[in-house]
Amino acid sequence: LLVGISFTMKAQDSLSLFKTLSNQYSQERAFRNNYYYNPASMSGYSSSSFSEFGVGYHDNKEKVYRQQLGNGSKGLTVEARSFQKLKPNRFVWGNASYQNLKTGSVKWNETLDYERIAPYITADSVGGKLNLERYQFAGGYLQNMNRWTVAGQISYSAQMGYRSKDPRMKSTTSDLRVNAGVSYKVFREYEVGIFGEFNKYTQNNSVQFQSLLGRPYVYMMSGFGFSNYLFNGGTRPANTYEEFAYKGGIQISNKQGKDFYFQAAAGTSNNIKGDNETNSYFDLSELKNETFELEGAKFFNVAEKHRLGISAGYSASRKTGSEYGYSMNTASLSQLFKREAYRRENYTASVKGLYQYSQDNFTITATPFFEYEEIKERRLYPNSGQKFVYSYFGLNADYRQKISNSQVLTFQPYFYKRTVNKSINALSTAGNAAVDEWVLQDYLFQASDITTFGTVLRYDFKLKKLPAFFVGAQYQTQKIQKKNNNFAGASIGITF
């Protein structure tokens, strides 16, 4: 790695900082980011090696929000990433990050990774501020052998969330992913590839109380405010989520995806929630998720300075929740049934474009996009549900200006809007006024239009015999229900 870094610094010294950054932060590469899900496609990721280290801080304040996710967060992020060409046919890459965050006003959720495990969360009506630490690292290796390319990547992330006052929630997660891919050059630069992924996820969470003056009631939620009354109200509730997931796909491309690519992937996962408050363990729910994804893109050169691209994609996800029923004999619980009681279907179709104009001292890139999404969510026992149909459209822009051989300024404004085409409320009351109010508030949030404006500004500069430094700032405002949610962030770092 040290040899690779030394080579990188020498190579970048021979180029202007502008050309180095244009390659390192290629907007076209970001446009076809999903193409690199197959690690065997990383051979065309970059024409040169690069590395980056940065530290950032952000403050996100939300006036309109989903209570189970909190009203924003603030905290520190430290991250590093690198892509190294060890030899013409051998590449390695990796990244690592650490976050220390504080999330405010989390309510009706005493778990992490809500979108992954919902609706089977542990919840109470009090909640509070949440401290969260995240660790993540990943590493990949690629080898070219004549017409064959073989590559693999391993990534691991872990979280710890906790609260230092009642209800004293503590949750830890671990997420291991192993990716592998193979591609074969069938003719000239046309390639066919296959890839696969294995994922193992675990979450352990508990809620404890120290106050002698009383405590809130804890629910084992099962969707739309309904809960598992047999396991509700524990004095020291503790749960485990365990998930195994598999995914595989195929890929066809030309010129390492720079001319065109097409890929399809399908996957399945199974997440089981168990109760382990006592010495006994009981399965509470099982959440199965089946996914299917399609994406294709085509790129064109127009004259010498113009580059065009168009991409279209489709994705489908169907989550099915099964719930366990037990006897009421408190001396010894025994399973009576397992039945499907929840389903969530999510279908998305998208199209986006790319236009890039390049000169020796500046580049302009525009990426417009449009997306159509349909979400249907319902449960049985009792019947309840909701449906949303959304349209999204927006524009991401990037302007990079060379000030001198050692100074570059980058300006990235963006805009997007979510429009609710249809929303259907078929919710049933849970019989608890506080719970019903939360469920209705959550529905109204999802049934609201959202308009977002933001911009990123970054200044890179290089001093003699030192790596290049950068400072950056970001601001975003989001309008929802006639109120504004605001985000501000700043970062500093080095590239080499």
In which residue ranges do the predicted regions lie?
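Outer-membrane beta-barrel "beta-signal"
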Residues: 14-17, 188, 484-496
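Outer-envelope beta-barrel architecture signal
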Residues: 45-51, 88-94, 146-152, 188-192, ...
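Transmembrane beta-strands of outer-membrane beta-barrel pores
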Residues: 55-61, 98-102, 143-147, 156-160, ...
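Outer-membrane beta-barrel translocator domains and adjoining extracellular loop/strand segments
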Residues: 62-68, 105-111, 162-169, 205-211, ...
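Residues on the lipid-exposed face of transmembrane beta-strands in outer-membrane beta-barrel proteins
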Residues: 78-84, 137-143, 178-184, 248-254, ...
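Long, internal scaffold/assembly segments composed of regular secondary structure
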Residues: 226-368
